[in-house]
Amino acid sequence: MTKTKEKAPAENVEARLEIFYKDKVVPKLMERFQYKNVMMVPKLQKIAINIGVGEAAAEPKLLETAMSELAQITGQKPQIRKSRKAISNFKLRENQPIGCRVTLRRKTMYEFLDRFVSLAVPRIRDFRGLNDTSFDGRGNYTTGIREQIIFPEIDIDKVPRISGMDISFVTSAATDEEAYVLLAELGMPFKKKNN
């Protein structure tokens, strides 16, 4: 009998952007902010993607379509989000499905960020950079995308309706400046600041 080396499972392989973070971004952030320990360096903790489908009350098929598109984009099954209270002006009842969301962590988070920065964002029409004022004061960044068709996983011919999504990048950074530098080093194309 010959012994063969077993290949490592795919889960143990690090994402390209995660390796880049450890090798290049961490030393730059340590130098820039004078951290004394590697554990003090901010890192990306999770990415939350949300699609709100307000018209799901009238057409439940729209929510199913949004869920399948979000699953294609992220590679993960979305959660259905339900309304918290009834609002008669919007013809909305309590606990009615109105959207879906996915939370990405670890390897899938870095893979999504890599695809988002290098493939999806350059496909945005009239793109001049992401707005850098959407930080929340605690080191988290949220941006809105108007069209889901910027992602290469979505087949434009099979999209019944153009819908947008909200993408939140949650970091361990204490300040917005640290989060801005972290995301910029990871390749996030922010608008150029006028000095």
Swiss-Prot record:
The protein here is known as: Large ribosomal subunit protein uL5
Quaternary data = Part of the 50S ribosomal subunit; part of the 5S rRNA/L5/L18/L25 subcomplex. Contacts the 5S rRNA and the P site tRNA. Forms a bridge to the 30S subunit in the 70S ribosome.
Q: What is the lineage of its organism?
A: Bacteria, Pseudomonadati, Chlorobiota, Chlorobiia, Chlorobiales
Give me the gene this protein comes from.
Answer: rplE
- Pfam families associated with the record: Ribosomal_L5, Ribosomal_L5_C
What does this gene product do? Answer: This is one of the proteins that bind and probably mediate the attachment of the 5S RNA into the large ribosomal subunit, where it forms part of the central protuberance. In the 70S ribosome it contacts protein S13 of the 30S subunit (bridge B1b), connecting the 2 subunits; this bridge is implicated in subunit movement. Contacts the P site tRNA; the 5S rRNA and some of its associated proteins might help stabilize positioning of ribosome-bound tRNAs.
Superkingdom in the source lineage: Bacteria
InterPro entries named among the record's database cross-references: Ribosomal_uL5, Ribosomal_uL5_bac-type, Ribosomal_uL5_C, Ribosomal_uL5_dom_sf, Ribosomal_uL5_N
Q: Does the keyword DNA-binding apply?
A: no
Q: Does the keyword Ribonucleoprotein apply?
A: yes
Family in the record: Belongs to the universal ribosomal protein uL5 family.
Which cellular component terms (GO) are annotated to the entry?
ribonucleoprotein complex; ribosome
GO MF term (any one): tRNA binding
Entry keyword set: Ribonucleoprotein, Ribosomal protein, RNA-binding, rRNA-binding, tRNA-binding
Organism source for this protein?
A: Chlorobium limicola (strain DSM 245 / NBRC 103803 / 6330)
List all membrane-crossing ranges: none
Q: Which GO terms describe its biological process?
A: translation
